[in-house]
């Protein structure tokens, strides 16, 4: 059993995509009994209860006293102490930038192998000269740098330098949790007073890049073609009031439901209530604000729902165009409206896409399959290359 230390700013109970990614992988690595895991992560509300549950599951979480960890002396000392105390063989930096700058220090403390994972924000880093030099140092100091999509790799590979060993490790989907669920669908449709109305769902943090504003603006056009069409926007974020005002200004406030943030255990049901899942994401900030992958599309597919994705970054990699869903220009209200209306009208095609999506995700995107690949990277098995 190899001994692994995960050093990360992003870990449950804090919510977010990276947090979920790391939490899912840690749970499966521990469950496989191939790795003894220790996690070093920041303090967060609810951490005590989470850490008790982690201990019961078979791994230890050590909390940094503040909510942010930087690659300075304080984190360095604590990390090296943990490496010594637990006789750590492999250090895994959950987000390469910036904490993986400590890779050489981890080796000095006794770690024989260092892995760093990327997610999407490194694309922005690669566009800034000083930040780009940080990525080069990380590439030089680690054994493996993982990436979540071919798109992100294409954008930042040169920044990590020729010495970096870049390996594909996307997020997975729990296909036992995310599945077609008629009972949950009926319950939530009753809660939100949707009845049998044709419904498009967008589940994501409410920020401009995700394209909820495009869906709201497209809804009048969709409703002219699809009687009773409704939009359910799931999630919280700084864009909420802007979206509420936009719905009012577009005359569709009565047909848009804002659920706010929902409990993690209710996320599968919110996918299941949809007839179509759409997130017309778009790239912003001259390419610095981009969708790294888009796990929500895969979760919707696992629930048997056809998906519509914007063509930002790695999002198209989560859709088999014209088979599991559609990829559209997320900047175009007309194209988004056409795609949504098309699938709401042609129910046979939509159902077939949903079934194909479920089959694809089950075959290619399960967490257990990807965790086995990560386990090889952590051990340094040549077969993983």
From Swiss-Prot:
It is an enzyme of class 2 (transferase). Keywords: Glycosyltransferase, Lipid biosynthesis, Lipid metabolism, Phospholipid biosynthesis, Phospholipid metabolism, Transferase, Virulence. GO terms for cellular component: plasma membrane. It catalyses: a 1,2-diacyl-sn-glycero-3-phospho-[alpha-D-mannopyranosyl-(1<->6)-D-myo-inositol] + GDP-alpha-D-mannose = a 2,6-O-bis(alpha-D-mannopyranosyl)-1-phosphatidyl-1D-myo-inositol + GDP + H(+); a 1,2-diacyl-sn-glycero-3-phospho-[alpha-D-6-acyl-mannopyranosyl-(1<->6)-D-myo-inositol] + GDP-alpha-D-mannose = a 2-O-(alpha-D-mannosyl)-6-O-(6-O-acyl-alpha-D-mannosyl)-1-phosphatidyl-1D-myo-inositol + GDP + H(+). GO terms for biological process: glycolipid biosynthetic process; phosphatidylinositol metabolic process; phospholipid biosynthetic process. InterPro entries: Glyco_trans_1, Glyco_trans_4-like_N, Glycosyltransferase_grp1. Pathway: Phospholipid metabolism; phosphatidylinositol metabolism. GO terms for molecular function: glycolipid 1,6-alpha-mannosyltransferase activity; glycosyltransferase activity; mannosyltransferase activity; phosphatidylinositol alpha-mannosyltransferase activity. GDP-alpha-D-mannose binds at residues 205, 210, 262, 299. Its EC number is 2.4.1.346. Belongs to the glycosyltransferase group 1 family. Glycosyltransferase 4 subfamily. Involved in the biosynthesis of phosphatidyl-myo-inositol mannosides (PIM) which are early precursors in the biosynthesis of lipomannans (LM) and lipoarabinomannans (LAM). Catalyzes the addition of a mannosyl residue from GDP-D-mannose (GDP-Man) to the position 6 of a phosphatidyl-myo-inositol bearing an alpha-1,2-linked mannose residue (PIM1) to generate phosphatidyl-myo-inositol bearing alpha-1,2- and alpha-1,6-linked mannose residues (Ac1PIM2). This is GDP-mannose-dependent alpha-(1-6)-phosphatidylinositol monomannoside mannosyltransferase. It comes from Mycobacterium tuberculosis (strain ATCC 25618 / H37Rv). The lineage of its organism: Bacteria, Bacillati, Actinomycetota, Actinomycetes, Mycobacteriales. The gene is pimB.
């Amino acid at each position: 059993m190899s001994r692994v230390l995960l050093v990360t700013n992003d870990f449950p109970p804090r919510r977010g995509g990276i947090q979920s990614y790391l939490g899912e992988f840690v749970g499966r690595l521990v469950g496989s009994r191939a790795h003894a895991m220790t996690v070093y992560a920041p303090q967060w509300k609810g951490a005590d209860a989470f850490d008790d549950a982690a201990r019961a599951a078979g791994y230890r979480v050590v909390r940094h006293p503040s909510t942010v960890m930087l690659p300075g002396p304080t984190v360095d000392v604590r990390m090296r102490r943990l490496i010594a105390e637990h006789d750590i063989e492999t250090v895994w930096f959950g987000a390469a930038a910036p904490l993986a700058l400590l890779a050489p220090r981890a080796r000095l403390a006794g770690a024989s192998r260092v892995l760093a994972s990327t997610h999407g924000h490194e694309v922005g880093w690669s566009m800034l000269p000083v930040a780009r030099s940080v990525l080069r140092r990380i590439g030089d100091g680690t054994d493996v740098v993982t990436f979540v999509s071919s798109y992100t790799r294409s954008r930042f590979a040169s920044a990590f330098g020729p010495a970096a060993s870049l390996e594909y490790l996307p997020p997975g989907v729990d296909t036992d949790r995310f599945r077609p669920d008629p009972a949950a669908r009926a319950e939530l449709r009753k809660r939100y007073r949707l009845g049998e109305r044709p419904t498009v769902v967008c589940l994501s943090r409410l920020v401009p890049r995700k394209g909820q504003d495009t869906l709201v603006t497209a809804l009048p056009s969709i409703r002219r073609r699809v009687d009773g069409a409704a939009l359910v926007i799931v999630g919280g974020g700084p864009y909420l009031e802007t979206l509420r005002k936009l719905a009012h200004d577009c005359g569709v406030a009565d047909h848009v439901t804002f659920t706010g943030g929902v409990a993690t255990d209710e996320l599968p049901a919110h996918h299941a209530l949809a007839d179509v899942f759409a997130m017309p994401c778009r790239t912003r900030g001259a390419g610095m604000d981009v969708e790294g992958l888009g796990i929500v599309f895969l979760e919707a597919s696992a629930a048997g729902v056809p998906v519509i994705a914007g063509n930002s970054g790695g999002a198209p990699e989560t859709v088999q165009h014209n088979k599991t869903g559609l990829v559209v220009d997320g900047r175009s209200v007309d194209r988004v409206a056409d795609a949504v209306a098309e699938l709401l009208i042609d129910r046979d095609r939509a159902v077939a896409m949903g079934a194909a999506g479920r089959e694809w995700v089950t075959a290619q995107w399960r967490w257990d399959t990807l965790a086995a690949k990560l386990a090889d990277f952590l051990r340094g098995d040549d077969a993983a290359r």
